[in-house]
Amino acid sequence: MEYTGIEIFVRLFKSNAYLIKIFKDFKQLETEDEMRANESLEKHATFVMTTLDEAISNIDNYDFVKDLLTRTGCSHQRFSEFQKDNFLKIRQPFLDAVKITLGDRYTDYMENVYTLTINFILQGLMDGYMDDTAIQIKLDSGHEIDRNIHEANDTTFVKAAES
């Protein structure tokens, strides 16, 4: 899973070099070798792959997967340079990395399954990113607070602003 995740991001940055600048922990990386050896990129790639694996493993539980993708997509709002269309840019690198990982086991049928699956996942992430039921507050101190509007109240925001 770790190898596949790194492969996805190497391919993503190779085809969309400007995207690496969004990531503060590895935006200085320039070569594929640097990317493959970087611990911060490895950590992020593993985190992304864990989320993808969780979504795929639970694909028969629509409510769980929808909630996971909504929360994950929404969490990307805190990155000022991130745009929802960035999710789509991982589609082909994901499919290419899966093909490499599966080798001879990657059939036309598997390609169709993974294409449908990644399209569903990416749409869920984009929907979550655009979810307007979440509020984010960035305090002057630079701390960010995410609150679900249904759970938040005025006291929550006052306490957050005072801290």
Predicted regions and their residues:
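Globin-like tetrapyrrole-binding proteins
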Residues: M1-S163
